[in-house]
């Protein structure tokens, strides 16, 4: 696997592949890779001739008092895992390469509406940071296809909307959430959990599953939400949000809506965990 921090190196290699008529897949990450990331790379390798991965802890998407400095950086282990999974080109830029004028002077991309609710309301500016870095990475790598995890459901919709609105010629593929044996969605932030918290963490998925089951049986959204919040609090969580939304617009769920998604974010100790479930009523 070729590794470089330099934009020109990435473009040169991708151009060489394109000159051969070969296809390129892209998986953007912030590193500290787990099996969920590796699954994205393996799926990318099945779909395209070559796989490019980026590792960049993006300062633009972290708010004040968030864990930018504490975010784990494990480049050596990540490189080994990526090589084994079939990645051929790894882009590891520094903030100075990505944002040479600094964040305050950086042109940014903002996806209106869908960026402002749920995680966007809890973390103002987060999705502006996500959309900007993903758009910038797309312009550097120029992939045919890009892969993202369905675990970050709102992020995936923000990126799909950006690609559509800006007419970017890139196919976006969402890959099912990879879970630990307990049902806990894999996340780099799971490393913040104590053993006791890790034992309690599967309650998040159980609460979401119970909500979906209740809605399918005709129980009101208000009732299933209150019951789920109570179960999370009893398990030691501090809920941030727990909501039922339209699956493609993230508008509040209406009685006539069939395609729904439950989205949850909750604190367990130091870790902010998110999860979701898309289902038909």
UniProtKB/Swiss-Prot annotation:
Main location: cytoplasm
Keyword Ligase: yes
Molecular-function annotations in GO: ATP binding; pantoate-beta-alanine ligase activity
Catalysis: reaction(s): (R)-pantoate + beta-alanine + ATP = (R)-pantothenate + AMP + diphosphate + H(+)
Localization per Swiss-Prot or TrEMBL: Cytoplasm
EC number(s) from the headed UniProt entry: 6.3.2.1
UniProt keyword annotation of Ribosomal protein present: no
Active-site feature positions: 37 (proton donor)
Residues that, per the record, bind (R)-pantoate: 61, 155
GO BP terms: pantothenate biosynthetic process
Keywords for this protein: ATP-binding, Cytoplasm, Ligase, Nucleotide-binding, Pantothenate biosynthesis
Gene Ontology CC: cytosol
Database matches in InterPro entries: Cyt_trans-like (IPR004821), Pantoate_ligase (IPR003721), Pantoate_ligase_C (IPR042176), Rossmann-like_a/b/a_fold (IPR014729)
Short name of one Pfam family: Pantoate_ligase
Residues annotated for beta-alanine binding in this entry: 61
Binding site for ATP: 30-37, 149-152, 178, 186-189
Biological or metabolic pathway of the protein: Cofactor biosynthesis; (R)-pantothenate biosynthesis; (R)-pantothenate from (R)-pantoate and beta-alanine: step 1/1
Other notes: The reaction proceeds by a bi uni uni bi ping pong mechanism.
NCBIfam families hit by this protein: cyt_tran_rel (TIGR00125), panC (TIGR00018)
Function: Catalyzes the condensation of pantoate with beta-alanine in an ATP-dependent reaction via a pantoyl-adenylate intermediate.
Family the UniProt entry places it in: Belongs to the pantothenate synthetase family.
Assembly: Homodimer.
Stated name of the protein: Pantothenate synthetase
Organism, scientific name: Shewanella sp. (strain MR-4)
